[in-house]
Amino acid sequence: MLTMKDVIREGDPILRNVAEEVVIPASEEDTNTLKEMIEFVINSQDPEMAEKYSLRPGIGLAAPQIGISKKMIAVHVTDTDGTLYSHALFNPKIISHSVERTYLQSGEGCLSVDREVPGYVPRYTRITVKATSINGEEVKLRLKGLPAIVFQHEIDHLNGVMFYDHINKENPFAAPDGSKPLER
């Protein structure tokens, strides 16, 4: 079982590397790692489990965050309309995105970042992601709102990008041009 001890923190060079593609069909080892990742995210949202194992609540996790430089992500997030998006994916890739941008009014956080980083993180409002599911099936997901933001955040990790790299350094709270805020 993964715990916060397994989550590496900013400053570790692996978080700045471009992760490797996972060979499909995935090995048993990669599949088990991905299972542990989604289990961690789900457990972190369960108050009892989070307290018992000192887990920081999270809605997504990328393999580089646990020291594995491979393209794997786990996301477990509920949209504003109550729809649950729970996915454990190999080799996720954004294949299209909207012109319209958004940002979380409260800013973004990260399990690998133990400090508050103030500022707006510009994201695409809608994205389409292509990936391979944990069961080995090709999937294509059309996402908008919070799930789209979470997927962009996790896919950034696979490319060595941290959320705060997107924040305007001169004016952290400048709303990105033509964007609409998303409240969480």
Curated annotation (Swiss-Prot):
Keywords: Hydrolase, Iron, Metal-binding, Protein biosynthesis
Catalytic activity annotation: N-terminal N-formyl-L-methionyl-[peptide] + H2O = N-terminal L-methionyl-[peptide] + formate
EC supergroup of this enzyme: hydrolase
Listed GO MF terms: metal ion binding; peptide deformylase activity
GO biological process: co-translational protein modification; translation
HAMAP family noted in UniProt: Pep_deformylase (MF_00163)
Native species: Bacillus anthracis
Protein name, entry field: Peptide deformylase 2
Cofactor binding comment, as recorded: Binds 1 Fe(2+) ion.
Positions of the catalytic residues: 154
Entries under InterPro entries matching the protein: Peptide_deformylase, Peptide_deformylase_sf
Pfam entry (one): Pep_deformylase
Function statement: Removes the formyl group from the N-terminal Met of newly synthesized proteins. Requires at least a dipeptide for an efficient rate of reaction. N-terminal L-methionine is a prerequisite for activity but the enzyme has broad specificity at other positions.
Required cofactor(s): Fe(2+)
Similarity comment: Belongs to the polypeptide deformylase family.
EC code: 3.5.1.88
Binding site for Fe cation: 110, 153, 157
Region forming the signal peptide: none
